[in-house]
From Swiss-Prot:
Keywords for this protein: Antibiotic, Antimicrobial, Secreted, Signal
Main location group: secreted
Subcellular location: Secreted
Tissue expression from the record: Expressed in the body wall, intestine, uterus and ovary.
One GO term of the biological process aspect: antimicrobial peptide secretion
Assigned GO CC terms: extracellular region
Source taxon at top rank: Eukaryota
UniProt protein name: Cecropin-P3
UniProt propeptide residues: 45-74
Native source species: Ascaris suum (Pig roundworm)
Amino acid sequence: MFLIYLLVQTAESSWLSKTAKKLENSAKKRISEGIAIAIKGGSRRRRSVGEEDAIPSHIEVNKFFLRKPAKEHI
């Protein structure tokens, strides 16, 4: 039973260390990108899903929000 425990601990710590390393590399990359953009004087790129065009530009806003709801099919 103890051997199984040791094997599981080793596998889990290996997975955690790989995941932590990936997160660390990702953070370093974002920081270096931000520094490069700041040095160039460009605008900051934001990594947010909310910045995507939530309402397609070809739809009028009033028509989009004031449209009638679809009827339910039972």
